[in-house]
Amino acid sequence: MKKILTLAAAALFMASCAQPEEVVDAPHEYHPEWSKNANMYEVNIRQYTPEGTFAAFQTHLPRLREMGVDILWLMPVQPIGVKNRKGVLGSYYSIQDYRGINPEFGNEEDFRSLVNAAHEQGFKLIIDWVPNHTAWDHPWMTESPEFYYHDPATGQITNGRDDHNNPTDWTDVAELDYENPAMMEAQRQDMLFWMDTYQVDGFRVDMAGGQTPEYWTETINHLRGHNPEVFMLAESEYYYLHESHFDMTYGWEFHHLLNNVAGKSADVQTIDDYLARQAKDFPADGYRLYFIDNHDENSWNGTVEKRIGNNAHAAFMLCVTMSQSMPLIYSGQEVGLNKSLRFFERDTIDWSAPSQADFYSKALALKKTQGALANGSWGGAQTRIATNNPSVYAFSRVKGDNIVTVFVNFSAEEVTIDYSGAIDEDYTNWFTGEEAELEEAGQITLPANGYLVLTHGEC
């Protein structure tokens, strides 16, 4: 199997402004218009409710819509393999049937009801797609064993491998062979099945770097021949996947950088270094998925509290406001999910914890209403504001008359800083509604683990 080795302070106020009728410097045509100021919410059906079903999750849709969620990403909804299964319920990513529905979650009509309800309430809904491997009891194992990668030394089908073709401990899955044209075409047809049968709006592709860019170019073009607005997210940081017409790639490096800055093993200069690399390697119109949590991080690397501590909201503000960013919220993040959810067993989210939905709704509304913060090249240029504190990151973004200025303090103490390079204007404090003046240079005080977001002008 050929693998890719390419390196790849806050109160209760909300403001709004009208959306522009025209967009200058619009991105490539493959980005759907509805995605330009969208956010994403990852849904873990198994752990979301005590029932762990589509129907039970569906009752949460009005709450999520009120919070401002746009795109629902459902972790895999297909049946999970039994052979070599890990744990009692198994991994969502061990797919037994690409076209089936996991009976743990409900049936075909339950899923169709969820998709229809989501669309009626204004959401887009995408599903996880796992192209790299299947369960050991997938029908292809007996019907088309040539679809799988066989170890040249032993002739045996191998366990799932990473996107550098290295062995893993994924003993519950078998590796597919992306040098087999029939298998690749079968994958495309299975993806089309979900678009045609259930009208899903796109796919989050697991381990998208495990296939060739040519495969994804052909596949995505094929999918867009059926629905030009299908949305494609790659779980990968390989820049070339944008050239294959993925709308968005993962910001893994930025996530780990936030963990380090919050944990004081790095200062904010590393953010500038990261942005310089991104500007060099990634297209200006490519969306980047920024997050402080997701299913991988929560289950395997610890909670947000463990990794980021009291800086969670400060870090998330960067996920909302940074250049090219689309912010992601994971299931339970809006109640401060305080445990690592078990991956192979039932482990229901505790929704009785104090709600942080007010913060998240204001943050998402900021993204939605400020044209300077729009996704990809829809948004405005980002300009650094210099400070004399290595724990404070500050910048402005500008689109037309719209200015968004952000100060984030990763220190556990209140700080008074000197700054320079701001845009001298009259602003509104987004989170308090108070009027504020900001000169080009001066001093400003920020609360511990806090942030200040100032807005000016129309979107």
Predicted features and spans:
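Active-site-proximal helices and loops of the catalytic beta/alpha 8
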Residues: V24, H28, D190, D196, ...
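Short, flexible loop/turn elements at secondary-structure junctions
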Residues: I45-T49, Q78, N102, P131, ...
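Sec-dependent N-terminal signal peptides
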Residues: I4-L12
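Carbohydrate-interacting/catalytic domains
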Residues: L5, S16-W73, P79, A118, ...
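Short, solvent-exposed turn/loop segments enriched in Gly/Ser/Thr/Pro and often Arg
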Residues: W73-G87, D128-H138, D206-T212, E235-Y240, ...
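Hydrophobic faces of well-ordered beta-strands that scaffold small-molecule active sites
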Residues: N39-Y41, L72-L74, L125-I127, F203, ...
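Substrate-binding/active-site clefts of carbohydrate-active enzymes
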Residues: E21-M40, N44-A55, T59-D70, P76-Y198, ...
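Active-site clefts of carbohydrate-active enzymes
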Residues: A284-K306
